[in-house]
A protein has these predicted regions:
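P-loop NTPase switch module centered on the Walker A-proximal segment
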Residues: 1-98, 102, 142, 210-213
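Accessory interaction regions appended to the cores of large information-processing enzymes
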Residues: 140, 160, 180, 184-191, ...
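Conserved short loop/turn motifs at secondary-structure junctions
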Residues: 8-9, 125-133, 168, 174-178, ...
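Amphipathic helical hotspot of TIR/SEFIR-family domains
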Residues: 103-119, 140-143
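Canonical P-loop GTPase G-domain recognition
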Residues: 121, 132-191
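Short glycine-/polar-rich loops that comprise or flank the Walker A/P-loop
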Residues: 67, 90-93, 118-122, 156-159
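Conserved ATPase-coupling elements of RecA-like P-loop NTPase cores
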Residues: 79-84, 102-109, 133-137
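Switch/connector loops and helix/strand junctions flanking conserved nucleotide-binding motifs
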Residues: 33, 105-106, 131-137, 169-174, ...
Length: 602
């Protein structure tokens, strides 16, 4: 029986974990044609490559010195915590990967805490030591202090450290002495990470993740915790609430390099993919046919945010997307629920809408962006934070926020966060930059990142993670400026936009199709202003001077999806289609809007 090591990689967004896995595959000669080896093999989802983040956990295996190493790539962002907890169930050890300059970030802390609670022993990899002004020795001390504060055992605190640069393709035990490859890391994994415990008995496998194939349907992925599974064997699927179903395994596959290989039998401790099970959910157990014993199901953190999803009912409905009806939207959300553990969906206030609950703005915006690329047209409302009643008191989610920024912007950043009910916990200098830590309500984070980046000229590095629930902190003032709302449907005209420049900043360029009720800019004052930017210049038979037709407009403000979701007010929606993104009022007609607001005020 082949020796196995199961290891998960923990790292913050963009600290280089996917690059490191690529190097491990390269080293183990798994990529057949090395010259054609692309970068970031693991981030196979367009969104993941663009944003430089890993959203879905993926499995890869490499064979080194005759030992099979199953590497599980975890998402680094706490918004995808649902993925993280499942993945750690499959691993026996973890690689903690940190940036030699940035050190441990809040998201790393979130996943590390989960790993320590589960008793996993880490191997610390300090990456990017080729960067200027890196501080590997200080970072190692920081990681030790962090693990101590998270309640790690003595054995866990006695961790091994490997330094290197995944991008340049080397790892060594001393960062001042670069090596030629990453064998130092692979050897350390074999020494430190324990082999999986082999438990004899009837088979048991906990389904930890799910893959989908257009040919065979849903595939269950998990680790065999006891006994062995064989292709064609009859099993019992143990679901929640003591429900049991008799099922047959059609095919068994193990992870081989980047792909999968069919096998007849999978032994205890290996990670495999099972084809042929129907109606399973993540957290179910594949058990013995005659004497089924269920494993405890996976616990996942609760959602902290909700958002209204509804069909696109704007005047431009159906022009750009393929899937535009509420039936399409419902089917897509139900499909997402099968593999996205931290998501919940409930019916909305009317038949065409749904309330979707998730872990944060990033979690939900990734779903919206994926749907947009698949050809969906939809509209989404302002994100709302979910409160809880604990001991008869209204409580709200509190996040731990860290900001790294140049010294000259510290005062401005502290003022912006405290205005949103944030409390400064820690402040320390790191060279020419300052590290700030705050506790802040989740709702205070909406729109904060874009404002901080503007105030610090793009220099701030912002990260946050859920800390827990605390009593409600009071009202937070939201965006103070009103919107510039279009009165007409038609093409935007430079002539009329030029005349309205002093009233605010625009989100669109001249010559763009707009409709009545679309938010086309931000007003300089508090209330909304209805404007007509479709008005053209009246032609006369008088000859105009040459300077008259030269209009100078500043470039429009362009939002990313997250920024748009954080920017909109309660009476606004974001319209998302495959080709464009627009902000609009829920009620498009100006007279109806006024009537509604006067009824509300009465």
């Amino acid at each position: 029986m082949q020796e196995i090591r199961n290891i998960a990689i923990i790292a913050h967004v963009d600290h280089g974990k996917t690059t490191l896995v690529d190097r491990m595959i390269y080293q183990a000669r798994q990529a057949r044609e090395q010259e054609k080896l692309g970068e970031l093999i693991l981030d196979n989802n367009d969104l993941e490559r663009e944003r430089g983040i890993t959203i879905l956990a993926k499995n890869v295996s490499v064979v080194y010195k005759g030992v099979k190493i199953n590497v599980i790539d975890t998402p680094g962002h706490s918004d995808f915590g649902g993925e993280v907890e499942r993945v750690l169930n499959m691993a026996d050890g973890v690689i903690l990967l940190v940036d030699a300059f940035e050190g441990c970030m809040p998201q790393t802390r979130f996943v590390l805490q989960k790993a320590i609670e589960m008793g996993k022993k880490p191997v610390l990899v300090i990456n990017k030591v080729d960067k200027l002004n890196c501080r590997p020795d200080e970072v190692q001390e920081e990681v030790f202090d962090l693990m101590f504060s998270l309640g790690a055992t003595e054995d866990q605190l006695d961790f091994r450290t490997v330094y290197g640069s995944a991008k340049q393709g080397w790892m060594s035990h001393d960062w001042r002495e670069p090596a030629s490859d990453i064998t130092a890391l692979l050897d350390t994994i074999l020494e430190v990470v324990p082999a999986p415990e082999v438990v004899e008995g009837t088979p048991q496998m906990l389904i930890s993740s799910l893959e989908y194939s257009p040919y065979v349907g849903r595939i269950a992925v998990g680790r065999v915790t006891r006994g062995s599974l064989k292709a064609g064997m009859n099993t019992t699927l143990c679901k929640r609430y003591d429900i049991q179903q008799k099922q047959k395994i059609k095919e068994l596959m193990v992870f081989d390099g980047l792909g999968k290989a069919k096998v007849e039998e999978v032994n205890c401790g290996d990670i495999c993919a099972v084809v042929g099970l129907e109606g399973f959910e993540i957290g179910d157990t594949v058990a013995d046919f005659e004497n089924p014993e269920a494993l405890p199901p996976i616990e996942v953190d609760e959602p902290t945010m909700s958002m209204l999803f509804c069909i696109n009912n704007s005047p431009f409905f159906g022009k750009e997307g393929k899937f535009v009806t509420s039936r399409h939207l419902k089917e897509r959300l139900e499909k997402e629920l099968e593999k996205n553990l931290a998501l919940r969906v409930k019916p909305g206030p009317n038949a065409d809408s749904f309330i979707v609950y998730g872990r944060g703005v990033l979690h939900l915006s990734v779903l919206i962006e994926t749907m947009r690329r698949e050809g969906f047209e939809l509209q989404v409302g302002q994100p709302k934070v979910l409160d809880k009643v604990i001991g008869g008191q209204r409580c709200e989610p509190i996040e731990m926020l860290t900001i790294d920024l140049p010294e000259e912007f510290v005062g401005r950043a502290i003022e912006m966060v405290t205005r949103r009910k944030g409390a400064l916990i820690q402040m320390e200098g790191r060279g020419d930059r300052t590290h700030l830590e705050f506790d802040i309500p989740s709702r205070g984070l909406m729109g904060l990142r874009s404002n901080l980046l503007t105030a610090t000229q793009g220099e701030a590095v912002v990260a946050h993670r859920l800390k827990g629930y605390e009593p409600y902190k009071g009202d937070i003032e939201r965006r103070t400026n009103g919107s510039l709302v279009s009165l007409e449907t038609g093409l935007s005209v430079a002539y009329s936009m030029d005349k309205l420049q002093d009233r605010g900043r625009f989100f669109i360029e001249p010559g763009v199709e707009i409709y009545e009720g679309q938010v086309v800019g931000e007003h300089t004052r508090e209330r909304d202003l209805n404007i007509n930017i479709c008005k053209t210049k009246k032609l006369t038979n008088m000859r105009a001077s040459g300077s008259d037709d030269k209009v100078m407009l500043p470039p429009p403000i362009v939002f990313s999806l997250e920024e748009a979701l954080e920017y909109i007010q309660e009476d606004e929606l974001v319209e998302v289609t495959p080709k464009s993104m627009r902000l609009r009022k829920i009620i498009l007609n100006e007279i109806e809007r006024k009537r509604k607001s006067s009824d509300f005020n009465c």
